[in-house]
Amino acid sequence: MKFKKVVLGMCLIASVLVFPVTIKANACCDEYLQTPAAPHDIDSKLPHKLSWSADNPTNTDVNTHYWLFKQAEKILAKDVNHMRANLMNELKKFDKQIAQGIYDADHKNPYYDTSTFLSHFYNPDRDNTYLPGFANAKITGAKYFNQSVTDYREGKFDTAFYKLGLAIHYYTDISQPMHANNFTAISYPPGYHCAYENYVDTIKHNYQATEDMVAKRFCSDDVKDWLYENAKRAKADYPKIVNAKTKKSYLVGNSEWKKDTVEPTGARLRDSQQTLAGFLEFWSKKTNE
């Protein structure tokens, strides 16, 4: 079956898998589409451009993941010590491979799960994606992070940095509150996920890395803990972005939801840059062990 502009996870033009299951909405945790909407009803609510994804490998205007990576680089460029200088040089040298990994995560199998994007979501409280039993962003991001470290140690630098790009994609996915609470493109109200991410693309330039920003680190030597903590921080902001007021505003077609979400979104973008900077330093540390 084909739906235009929407799949279960993200907002792309692609085939979707239709799962023969019934899922009840639960307002206290994961939110799902309460009453299945007809394809034309969903389509009418969706914007006619791709959402917060990786729509071009190196165009930050339409690639929020890569934009966050470039902001993280700016943060790392301050207070450069020997290890950080080496990391910065390598990130610059292998920028193309990193960018391609970030991009492919949204456009190639097995990374985008045949257009369902199941592995791009992760609820840290339930330790699952939006369909329990499938690989989530914590598991998938950790897998490519660890493969990247192994490839680097073996001198396979092109694949190491490509897989680092994949890991960056999953890590930054769950720094978005909707992804950290399994609120998908067809969660109620259908299309709000996509509209919100498109809105982020229009305002993110207001929240670039500044001199006072530092790399934020989590106190763990396990990358799964890093992904968990990153999602936990994002989920804490979920009620500020998805609530009764913002849903109603979106459904009636006014822009009040944008005004209500701009402040928490800006704070979320800044935090995402800083935790990603820490994530990159953590990766560098692991490659040198």
Curated annotation (Swiss-Prot):
Principal location class: secreted
Top class in the EC scheme: hydrolase
InterPro entries linked to this entry: PLipase_C/P1_nuclease_dom_sf, PLPC/GPLD1, Zn_PLipaseC
Subcellular location: Secreted
Cited Pfam families: Zn_dep_PLPC (PF00882)
Regulation of protein activity: Enzymatic activity of LmPC-PLC can be specifically inhibited by its propeptide added in trans. The tendency of the enzyme to oligomerize, which appears to largely attenuate the enzymatic activity, may be one of the mechanisms regulating phospholipase activity in the host cell during the different steps of the infection cycle of L.monocytogenes. Enzyme activity is inhibited by EDTA and o-phenanthroline in vitro.
Binding-site list for Zn(2+) 3: 106, 120, 169, 173
Disulfide bond sites: none
Residue numbers binding Zn(2+) 1: 52, 65, 173
A cellular-component GO term for this protein: extracellular region
EC number per UniProt: 3.1.4.3
List of residues binding Zn(2+) 2: 179, 193, 197
Reactions it catalyzes: a 1,2-diacyl-sn-glycero-3-phosphocholine + H2O = phosphocholine + a 1,2-diacyl-sn-glycerol + H(+); 1,2-dihexadecanoyl-sn-glycero-3-phosphocholine + H2O = 1,2-dihexadecanoyl-sn-glycerol + phosphocholine + H(+); 1-hexadecanoyl-2-(9Z-octadecenoyl)-sn-glycero-3-phosphocholine + H2O = 1-hexadecanoyl-2-(9Z-octadecenoyl)-sn-glycerol + phosphocholine + H(+); 1,2-di-(9Z-octadecenoyl)-sn-glycero-3-phosphocholine + H2O = 1,2-di-(9Z-octadecenoyl)-sn-glycerol + phosphocholine + H(+)
Removed propeptide positions: 26-51
Annotated cofactor note: Enzymatic activity is specifically dependent on the presence of Zn ions, since Cd(2+), Cu(2+), Ni(2+), Co(2+), Fe(2+), Mn(2+), Ca(2+) and Mg(2+) cannot substitute. Binds 3 Zn(2+) ions per subunit.
Annotated SMART domains: Zn_dep_PLPC
Domain of life of the native organism: Bacteria
Domain Zn-dependent PLC: 52-289
Keyword annotations of the record: Hydrolase, Metal-binding, Secreted, Signal, Virulence, Zinc, Zymogen
Required cofactor names: Zn(2+)
Annotated signal sequence range: 1-25
Quaternary structure annotation from Swiss-Prot or TrEMBL: Forms monomers, dimers and higher order oligomers, but only the monomer is enzymatically active.
Protein family (similarity comment): Belongs to the bacterial zinc-metallophospholipase C family.
Record's function text: Major virulence factor whose phospholipase activity facilitates pore formation by the pore-forming toxin listeriolysin O (LLO), leading to vacuolar membrane disruption and vacuolar escape of L.monocytogenes, which enables the bacterium to spread in the host. Acts as a phospholipase C exhibiting broad substrate specificity, with the highest activities towards diacylglycerophospholipids with phosphocholine, phosphoserine, and phosphoethanolamine head groups, but less towards phosphoglycerol or phosphoinositol head groups. Is also able to hydrolyze sphingomyelin and plasmenylethanolamine.
Name of the featured protein: Phospholipase C
Gene this protein is translated from: plcB
